C-alpha cells in the first residue's frame, strides 16, 4: 500500500512542477514588435515576433503634438493586453501607428500595413492599456534598388518616413491633444527587464506547490496507516 502512495505522490509532484513551469513562462512574453491578428476571430490577439533582419522592417511610431517619434516595444503582457515601452519618460500620445513591412522573396515590392491604436492611461500602473480601435490600410511601395547611390536602407527608411507623414496629416485633423492635469500624479516608464522578477515568482510558486503536496501526501499516508491499524 505504501508503495502505491509513493507512486501517486510522485505523479502529482511531477504534474505540479510541470504546471508551475508552464504558468511561469506564460506570465510574460518578450519581443521586439507588436502584431494584431485581424484575420482570425480573435481580432485583438497580440503576437510577439523576434526580428533578425531589417528586411522585415517593423517600426512603431507614436504621434505627439510635436510630430513623429520612434518607440521600441519592450514587453507585451498577453493576459492583460497591456503594453510597456522602453522609455525614460511618459509616453504621452493619443495615437500609435504600427508599420509592418512584408518582404516578398529577395526583392520588393513591399506591402506596408498601418494600424491605428488609441492609448488609454492606466493610472494605477506603469503601463498604457491597448484598445484595439483598428483602422487597416495597405499600400505598395515601389521597388528600391539595393545598389543605388544612397543605399537600400536609406531609401527604405525615407519611404517609411514619407508614408508615415502622409498618414499623419490625415490623423491630425481628428487629433485631440493630450491635456496635462496638474493634480494628476506623473509616472515614469523606464526600460526594465522583468524576466528576472518573473523567474523568481516562478520558483517561489514551485516551492509552495512542492511544500503543499508534501504536507498533503504525508497527511494522507498518516490517515491511511491510522485507518489500517
UniProtKB/Swiss-Prot annotation:
Residues making up the signal peptide according to the UniProt record: 1-19
Domain of life the protein comes from: Eukaryota
Stretches that traverse the bilayer: 204-224
Keywords: Membrane, Signal, Transmembrane, Transmembrane helix
GO cellular component: membrane
Keyword Transmembrane carried by entry: yes
Subcellular localization(s) per the UniProt record: Membrane
Extracellular topological domain residue ranges: 20-203
Keyword Cytoplasm: no
Cytoplasmic side: 225-229
Membrane topology reported for the UniProt record: Single-pass membrane protein
Protein name: 23 kDa piroplasm membrane protein
Species of provenance: Theileria annulata
The organism's taxonomic lineage, starting at the top: Eukaryota, Sar, Alveolata, Apicomplexa, Aconoidasida
